[in-house]
């Protein structure tokens, strides 16, 4: 049967379907990773998204763009926590708030960080995204500190490590601490470092 639809309409329809399928695939990957599936298979994604396996394979040809869309979705989800202003004007109070905020952020994002760690070696986007995340963490920490502490390289490096996503991940995943225990452990390290420089 010959279609009497204009070619542009048929093309636009295919483009809309492709976009919708892509959104379903990204949402499916996010849900699978959130559920603890570190490296979802094409079959798992197809089942979760409700699309055909061939459709998934077509999108899997460009994994970096899928990772980018997943990262953008996560950033939008976490932005209200990141952007919230500090209630405290005192630098120590800001650090306490930063720890509480990062504990919530890291806990919500940890399944995605675990998955990203597995794939980073073969993804230019994930490597760049990791570098961006670490740069943002350091900049946020520097903005909360007194100038003399920010410029103390040993102190800053140690505090940056204590408050990093990697430390949270190690305490939660490798040492198997509960979220409250992980937060208390980091708080102990943070206060010990502050005490070590006489503040």
Predicted regions and their residues:
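Basic, helix-initiating cap at the start of DNA-binding domains
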Residues: 1-39, 43-48, 65
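Amphipathic alpha-helical linker/stalk segments
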Residues: 31-40, 47, 68-98
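Residues within the helices of the helix-turn-helix
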Residues: 43-44, 54, 64, 169
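Short hydrophobic/aromatic patch on the recognition helix
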Residues: 50-60
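Helical hydrophobic small-molecule/effector-binding pocket
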Residues: 72, 76, 92-119, 128
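Amphipathic alpha-helical packing segments from all-alpha helical-bundle domains
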Residues: 104, 108, 114, 122-157, ...
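Amphipathic C-terminal alpha-helical segment
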Residues: 156-179, 192-199
């Amino acid at each position: 049967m010959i279609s009497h639809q204009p070619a542009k309409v048929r093309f636009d329809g295919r483009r809309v379907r492709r976009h919708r399928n892509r959104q379903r695939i990204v949402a499916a990957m996010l849900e699978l990773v959130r559920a603890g599936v570190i490296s979802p298979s094409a079959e798992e994604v197809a089942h979760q998204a409700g699309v055909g396996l061939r459709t998934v394979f077509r999108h899997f040809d460009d994994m970096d763009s899928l990772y980018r869309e997943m990262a953008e979705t996560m950033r939008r989800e976490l932005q209200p926590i990141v952007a919230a202003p500090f209630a405290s004007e005192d630098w120590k109070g800001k650090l306490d708030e930063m720890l509480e905020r990062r504990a919530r952020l890291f806990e919500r994002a940890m399944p995605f960080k675990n998955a990203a760690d597995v794939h980073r070696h073969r993804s230019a986007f994930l490597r760049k995204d990791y570098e961006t995340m670490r740069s943002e963490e350091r900049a946020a920490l520097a903005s909360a500190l007194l100038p003399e502490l920010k410029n103390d390289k040993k102190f800053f490096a140690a505090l940056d490590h204590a408050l990093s996503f990697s430390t949270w991940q190690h305490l939660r995943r490798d040492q198997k601490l509960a979220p409250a225990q992980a937060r208390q452990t980091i708080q102990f390290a943070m206060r010990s470092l502050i005490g070590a420089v006489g503040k």
